[in-house]
Amino acid sequence: MAIQTSNLGYPRIGLQREWKKTLEAFWSNKIDEEQFLTTMKEIRLQHVKVQQEKGIELIPVGDFTYYDHVLDTAYMLGFIPSRFSEFTSYLDVYFAMARGSKDHVASEMTKWFNTNYHYIVPEYEEGLQISLKDNRPLRLYEEAKKELGVDGKPVILGPYTFLKLAKGYNEEQFATILKELVAPYVQLFSELHAAGAQIIQVDEPIFASLTKDEINQAKELYEAIHKEVPNANLLLQTYFDSVEENYEEIIAFPVSGIGLDFVHGKEGNVNAISKYGFPADKILAIGCIDGRNIWRADLDDVLSLFTTLQNQITAKGLIVQPSCSLLHTPIDKTEETHLTSELFDALAFANQKLEELVLIHSALTKGVESISSDLTTYRNAHHAIRSSAARNREDVKVARTSLKEDDFSRPLPFEKRYELQQVALQLPLLPTTTIGSFPQTSEVRQTRKQWRNGDITNEQYNQFIEKETAKWIRYQEDIGLDVLVHGEFERTDMVEYFGERLAGFSFTKNGWVQSYGSRCVKPPVIYGDVAFISGMTIKETVYAQSLTEKVVKGMLTGPVTILNWSFVRNDISRKEVSYQIALALRHEIELLESSGIRVIQVDEPALREGMPLKEKDWDAYITWAVQSFLLATSSVENETQIHTHMCYSNFEDIVDAIRALDADVISIETSRSHGEFINTLKHTTYEKGIGLGVYDIHSPRVPSKDEMFTIVEQSLQVCDPKYFWINPDCGLKTRRTEEVIPALEHMVQAAKDARSLLKTNA
């Protein structure tokens, strides 16, 4: 049986974030289109070359993008909203869809399944002519072949997942639109096959969570495609979970190979193969290296998996590959020499994961003895990190085992608390606030860099932060906001900032991953037991409050978001790590309260994204996620108002969970999703404080007062004015001052108009 190495996708951003820098230089007109395209080609080919040099046989092509692979697919198929029809060039249309423009609202952006990557949501419109507008995968396949002699593996987002992720149609239209996708996909696969593509990877991650009716519908789709292009070798790729419930149907699809996730879906996929076997005429692509985390693989465990599978199946061939695209991991760990040896030795970034694939391939084809020294190295690394003091703290263990039931609930129910809070805070009807951060200007970033490099003193840096804070407190007062924030000028990132101040975290120098577009994040590494050390936000928040008579919110990131936006140790459950973080935050919240801060926001934007793909697994996750939030926030007095914030999510699935958080006020992204959550609230009630975001902060355009007033008006049809707040969709860190101030002025005026309307109607 032939065994090959393969990769599902490579990080786009470049070892020194060249991709990000090129994008932003183009957007700011520092380079022209020709230079942009030339540089992007160089980066793209370099990524192929790295994989070639690492010994990967099936190298992905077409996974590279200028922004997002879902957006690439939408453009390729002609899913271009009519509001962008005035743009003529490819890049103008493409980036307008992604980012919006002065006069055009961007397409919606949301989380890619349960990851921290965001995709641009395809929009279907009536009368849309679906066709293969642009065979970009073919161009990239031919480019790699011509420039590097690499017969690559084209990577395509599959038609079923693509349409399921799209919006703008009703359920009755789905089957019809699906049939319309057959022709362009047939043309795409046919042209790739004719050009010599030996195997074509078709990503269908949504197959992990389909019903029987849906999987049968998808099978009919692939049968229709196969009928027209029977000779194209399609590898149907699933990831992020098992396909256990639909495995029997999936192995009957008319494709040449099937890729399964044996990391995040190991138990289910192994069970399915044990029960149903695997077709002898198909290739099995085994996702055995974790594409979503940064830890070295347990090679003994992986080789044991292959033994189990090889004893049960007689496939046409095997492919050794990651569990998903390596998009979700940093590129290379070699620069992280500042880390302790026990942590450094435990890590594997994208390039190291490629090396692991080659090691496994060697063991399978040449015998385990061919990697005996590597196995010893790996075993020693695993033992060193497991037995480290950082992973065996007695104080953390005692705190966890001492928890009682009343540690997870507030003393009084919401209605009674809110009455006390209204007396204490003296806020108007429809209070206005922001989500937390204000613009991180080049001056802010440069000053922080100087401080970190030791070029300025702590005192100089603190004076600068206080100056920025005071300036924005004045701005907020002048604008007329009701609840102010200190602006978070001291923070690089809403997770990294807290991780730097808690035990159990470590940080990379170059561990960047793409979040959305050119935005890259450097997730903390939770490698040990998490514990409180000292106050993290007290100084800045108390200083801001001293400057104003108005209420200033304390700003924290919640335990589940810190968990979901970090690379997390894999030797204990995520629930246990989340509880450790919650206990540390509980201490911080108590310190804020005792320092006179009466409104404390604990952001949980990542609560929804951490949900398992399968509905049957939701309850268990939601239970411990909600309990983590309650553990962090429930020790405050009734008069202290707890806020939380969420963004980028499909909220209709978790309305009950949002309610169970028992936050006094929740703010939710609304405008970018075109009022989707407002529609959700038409079918359910939410009887606590809520603010539905009235403008999209991800676009540079300044919305008018009337636009915001319309969203407020729509919101008040489903929300009780008594409990309604007015705020932007998200934090304003990435916007410019000249965009933020007029937008907030319009927002405050919209709030005043809404109050007048309520008064008139009353």
UniProtKB/Swiss-Prot annotation:
Gene3D superfamilies: 3.20.20.210. GO terms for molecular function: 5-methyltetrahydropteroyltriglutamate-homocysteine S-methyltransferase activity; zinc ion binding. One of its GO terms (biological process) is methylation. Its cofactor is Zn(2+). Zn(2+) binds at H645, C647, E669, C730. L-homocysteine binds at I435, G436, S437, E488, D603. Its EC number is 2.1.1.14. Coiled coil: none annotated. L-methionine binds at I435, G436, S437, E488, D603. The active site is at H698. It is an enzyme of class 2 (transferase). 5-methyltetrahydropteroyltri-L-glutamate binds at R17, E18, W19, K20, K111, R519, C520, W565, E609. The keyword Transferase applies. Keywords: Amino-acid biosynthesis, Metal-binding, Methionine biosynthesis, Methyltransferase, Repeat, Transferase, Zinc. This is 5-methyltetrahydropteroyltriglutamate--homocysteine methyltransferase.
